[in-house]
C-alpha cells in the first residue's frame, strides 16, 4: 500500500457505517493517533473534549519533527529553501481545494484567536470611519473581544445581535434588523462550541450584503472545521479562520483565508517586502 514519507496512505478508503466497523478497522483507526487512551501525566484515560481540541495524528507528529530539524529559511537560493517554498505553495493550493476557495489567499498565524484579532483589527481600521461593527451574542470571545477593542479604537459602535437560547442559534432574520448602510464590519460564528449548532453563514452574509455591500465579513470557523464542510466560495465573505489542532493537527498555529479586498487593506508589513504579504517572519513549514 502506497504511503508518503510521513506514513499517510495515498488512497482514499471508504469508511463503513459505524455498525460495520470491525475490531480490526477500529484498531487501525486508533493506531493513527497519539495518546488515544493514555495521558503522559495522568496515565490511563479516555479523551473526552467537546470543544477544546482533538487527538493528534501520529503523521502530524512525524511531519512536525521532520521540518523542525531543517535549518534552511524560505526565500534563500538553495535546494533546501526551494523545497520548503514548494511545500508551502502546494499546501496553500490544497487548502484552497479543501475549503473551496479558488480566490483570495491563505496565511498562518500564532493561533486562530490571534488571526481573528488581526483580521478584525485591519477591517475596522481600514474601513470608512464611523459606522457599526456587528456581531452576535452566540460568538466566542475571540471575535467579541476583538470587535469590542478595535471598534472603540476606530470610533465605531459595537452591536451584538441576540441569539435564540431555545435553538442555540442566530439566524439571518436575527441579523437583518441590525444591519444598516453604515455596517462596516460584521462577524459570524459558523458553529458554536457551546451549543454545538451551526449557523447559515451564506444566508447571514446575503442579508448583510443586501444593505451594506461594502461591509467586511469575517467568519470564525474554528469549531465548525472539525464537524462540517467548508465552502468559502458560496459564503461571499472576506475572512475565514480555523484552528487546525481541532482537526487532528497540533497546537501552535492558526490558519486564515482572506479575500483580495481584505488583503489589500493597510496592514503590518516589512519595509521593502511584498505589500500583500500578511505573514511576518519565517513560517513553520511543518504547519503547512
Question: What is the meaning of each model-derived region?
Answer:
Residues 2-4:
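Acidic, Ala/Val/Gly-enriched low-complexity intrinsically disordered segments
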Amino acid at each position: 500500500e502506497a504511503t508518503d514519507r510521513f506514513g499517510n496512505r495515498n488512497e482514499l478508503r471508504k469508511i463503513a457505517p459505524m455498525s460495520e466497523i470491525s475490531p480490526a478497522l477500529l484498531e487501525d483507526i486508533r493506531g493513527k493517533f497519539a495518546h488515544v487512551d493514555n495521558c503522559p501525566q495522568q496515565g490511563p484515560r479516555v479523551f473526552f473534549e467537546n470543544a477544546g481540541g482533538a487527538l493528534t495524528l501520529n503523521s502530524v507528529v512525524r511531519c512536525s519533527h521532520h521540518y523542525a530539524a531543517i535549518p534552511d529559511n524560505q526565500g534563500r537560493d538553495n535546494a533546501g529553501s526551494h523545497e520548503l517554498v514548494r511545500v508551502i505553495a502546494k499546501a496553500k493550493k490544497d487548502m484552497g481545494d479543501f475549503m473551496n476557495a479558488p480566490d483570495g489567499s491563505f496565511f498562518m498565524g500564532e493561533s486562530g484567536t490571534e488571526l481573528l484579532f488581526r483580521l478584525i483589527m485591519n477591517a475596522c481600521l481600514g474601513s470608512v470611519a464611523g459606522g457599526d461593527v456587528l456581531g452576535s451574542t452566540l460568538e466566542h470571545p475571540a471575535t467579541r473581544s476583538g470587535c469590542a477593542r478595535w471598534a472603540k479604537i476606530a470610533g465605531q459602535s459595537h452591536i451584538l445581535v441576540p441569539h435564540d437560547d431555545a435553538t442555540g442559534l442566530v439566524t439571518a432574520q436575527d441579523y437583518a434588523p441590525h444591519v444598516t448602510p453604515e455596517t462596516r464590519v460584521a462577524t459570524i460564528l459558523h458553529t458554536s462550541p457551546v451549543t454545538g449548532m451551526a449557523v447559515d453563514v451564506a444566508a447571514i452574509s446575503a442579508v448583510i450584503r443586501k444593505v451594506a455591500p461594502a461591509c467586511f465579513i469575517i467568519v470564525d470557523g474554528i469549531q465548525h472545521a472539525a464537524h462540517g464542510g467548508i465552502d468559502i466560495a458560496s459564503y461571499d465573505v472576506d475572512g475565514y479562520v480555523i484552528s487546525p489542532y481541532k482537526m487532528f493537527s497540533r497546537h501552535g498555529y492558526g490558519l486564515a483565508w482572506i479575500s483580495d479586498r481584505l488583503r489589500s487593506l493597510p496592514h503590518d508589513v516589512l519595509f521593502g517586502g511584498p505589500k500583500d504579504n500578511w505573514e511576518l517572519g519565517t513560517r513553520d513549514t511543518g504547519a503547512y
